[in-house]
């Protein structure tokens, strides 16, 4: 009888320890499925595992840059599935918020609504614009990339022309990564 009691006690203790370990590993530690990354090198290294290629740090003439990753969950076991490089770019004495986003999943269904800007190396690049923002996006090897700029008010025409060329060149840089 003592041997059976010891086995039952051991099974109960293992179940408790297993429950604690599972809770620690799966307890949400990120308030959102996104986390900040300290450096470009860390971002690039983390994203290599996903197959999503990160363009060079100077793909846009950033004044200041922030890096973050979108995660597939909120717990300790979450893995990166997308990245965001964001910051300000200055033109004509004004600062414009810019973002470059790359994801391993095509979850962006705007290609039917947005006009095609051009095909670059057999990759369609789409462009959408409003008075205070401009968006370019493309899909290559199943990965989606978006590059966008925002203004505080209506963008002057010279800024529109500048960012039109700048964002398109950033898209070309992304496509060239896969060549």
List each model region and its residues.
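N-terminal Sec-pathway targeting helices
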Residues: 1-20
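Residue-level detector of intrinsically disordered, flexible termini
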Residues: 3-4, 14, 81, 93, ...
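Membrane-interface motif at the C-terminal end of an N-terminal transmembrane signal
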Residues: 18-33
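Long, compositionally biased, charged low-complexity segments
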Residues: 23-24, 40-43, 47, 160-163
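Short, flexible coil/linker elements and helix-boundary hinge sites characteristic
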Residues: 27-28, 48-53, 153, 179
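Short, solvent-exposed recognition patches
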Residues: 33-135
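A short, solvent-exposed beta-edge/loop patch
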Residues: 108-179
């Amino acid at each position: 009888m003592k041997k059976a009691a010891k086995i039952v006690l051991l099974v109960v203790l293992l179940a408790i320890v297993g429950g604690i370990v599972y809770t620690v590993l799966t307890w949400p530690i990120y308030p959102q499925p996104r986390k900040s990354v300290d450096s470009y090198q860390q971002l690039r290294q983390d994203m290599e595992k996903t197959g999503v290629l990160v363009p060079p740090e100077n793909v846009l003439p950033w004044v200041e840059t922030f890096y973050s990753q979108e995660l597939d969950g909120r717990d300790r076991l979450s893995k990166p599935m997308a990245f965001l490089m964001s910051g300000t770019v200055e033109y004509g004495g004004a600062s414009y918020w810019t973002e470059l986003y790359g994801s391993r999943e095509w979850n962006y269904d705007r290609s039917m609504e947005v006009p095609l800007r051009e095909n670059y190396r057999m990759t369609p690049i789409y462009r959408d614009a409003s008075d205070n923002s401009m968006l370019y996006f493309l899909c290559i090897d199943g990965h989606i990339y978006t590059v966008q700029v925002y203004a505080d008010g209506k963008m002057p025409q010279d800024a529109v022309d500048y960012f039109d060329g700048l964002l398109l060149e950033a898209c070309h840089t992304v496509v060239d990564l896969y060549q």
